[in-house]
């Protein structure tokens, strides 16, 4: 639904991805990989066998001479709908923070073996899409997450990792996507679904 599994932005046409459902800014990126080991990413070398559901490297928005470092990095982790149990190894917050730590370690190289400057100043964004179960609530509380005003998710900023993280329920994901589209449909005077 969002992006094909075990694919990259190099081999998936724009019309076969629905990244806008999570955040419309994700449609504009430099490189995206889905369910591919960090060590196997094309043009980038990160010594790790971890496989984020989605890892997205964004273009810088400022114009610079030569090849620019990444403006931001986005990690998306999906958990199966209606999943009940999680043990500590399956804690999605630990998972995304682990991916981010590996990327920030400074061992990331381009396809020619040159180090890619991923400084501590580059912002990271993490989206965890899952049902909000009692265990997810426990993980969120432990990490100091704040409940969203609609009670359908959590958010947090981790200063040590320079990472903004959202835990989004599947219901909230669908609800927010509908709301974003309804505004456009209303402006175009098209039928609106509620």
Language-model segment annotations:
Residues 1-194:
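Charged, terminal alpha-helix-loop-beta segments
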